[in-house]
């Protein structure tokens, strides 16, 4: 039975992450030459088959290849220091596609990688708040749903990344409402799950757990934060017991923490 491990992490800038030690602190040049950074430590300790990063903020391909993964694909923005996603893997992709049909802005927010048994859609949804709520709900979300539905006609889909949405009140503990927690954005998220017959893997395995993927250090110390990062998988996979792990990992260096998905499925 094949076993696949995926990790997703909004790293809030690849350049800065490569200078962080495993505790999230900044390293000087001398330390960086002799000590593994937090991203290298994560990859070495967890050994993901597929690594999905968001908000890499690279305008051109970085020389850093994650632990010499065989295949590394980027979708980069033309705007310096903004957005960008990356998928690194030891598995040979069959195809790679960028962006979403119907979305004119080229912000490097989506990359779709096809493997033998499934697609991985690595996504960094826009955090736009009330100023562009209409765009988020009426343009971005429908385009993402259509993209998933088209791919589903061929094989299963793993949608992962920072989707910038708080599905329920169980998924946040904050003193004020943040973008992503509006009624409209929540409705769009659940519409995606319903119309694509998909499930939130973490919530499926941990229906009552309060745990958060986003929040600064001072927020974490107070038990505050929000769950903005997800692995969305076919409901049929969840019901068949294909998901054997979906949880958060304690690695620092970003305002997000990484999440991991473990799959065990029959060929």
For each of these PLM feature ranges, what is it?
Residues 1-66, 77, 82, 267:
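N-terminal, active-site-proximal structural segment of metallo-dependent hydrolase catalytic domains
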Residues 3-18, 117-130, 160:
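Active-site-proximal beta-strand elements of phosphoester/diester hydrolases
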Residues 6-10, 39-61, 120, 147-171, ...:
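Active-site beta-strand/loop signature of hydrolases that rely on acidic residues for catalysis
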Residues 26, 101, 125-141, 173-178:
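Surface-exposed cleft-lining segments at the edges of enzyme active sites
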Residues 56-128:
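Structured beta-strand-rich core segments of catalytic domains in phosphoester-bond hydrolases
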Residues 80-96, 219-240:
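Conserved beta strand-loop-helix elements of the APE1-like EEP
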Residues 89-90, 113-116, 223, 234-235, ...:
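Active-site beta-strand termini and strand-to-loop segments that position acidic
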Residues 141-228:
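Metal-dependent phosphoesterases centered on the DNase I-like endonuclease/exonuclease/phosphatase
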């Amino acid at each position: 039975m094949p076993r696949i491990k995926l990790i997703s992490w909004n790293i809030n800038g690849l350049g800065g992450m490569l200078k962080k030690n495993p505790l999230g602190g900044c390293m000087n040049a001398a330390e960086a030459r002799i000590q593994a950074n937090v991203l290298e430590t994560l990859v070495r300790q967890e050994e993901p088959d597929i690594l999905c990063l968001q908000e890499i903020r690279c305008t051109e391909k970085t020389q850093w290849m994650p632990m010499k993964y065989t295949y590394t694909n980027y979708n980069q923005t033309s705007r310096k220091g903004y957005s960008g996603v990356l998928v690194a893997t030891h598995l040979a992709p069959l195809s790679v596609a960028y962006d979403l049909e119907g979305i004119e802005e080229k912000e490097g927010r989506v990359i779709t990688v096809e493997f033998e048994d499934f697609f991985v859609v690595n996504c960094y949804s826009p955090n736009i708040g009330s100023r562009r709520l209409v765009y988020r709900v009426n343009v971005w979300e429908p385009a993402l749903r259509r993209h998933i539905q088209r791919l589903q006609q061929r094989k299963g889909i793993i949608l992962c990344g920072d989707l910038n949405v708080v599905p329920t009140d169980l998924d946040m503990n904050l003193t004020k409402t943040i973008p992503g927690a509006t009624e409209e954005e929540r409705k769009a998220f659940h519409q995606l799950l319903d119309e694509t017959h998909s499930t939130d893997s973490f919530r499926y395995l941990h229906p009552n757990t309060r745990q958060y993927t986003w929040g600064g250090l001072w927020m974490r110390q107070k038990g505050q934060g929000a769950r903005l990062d997800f692995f969305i998988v076919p409901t049929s996979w969840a019901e068949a017991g294909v998901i054997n792990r979906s949880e958060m990992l304690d690695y620092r260096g970003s305002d997000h923490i990484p999440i991991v998905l473990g799959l065990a499925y029959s060929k």
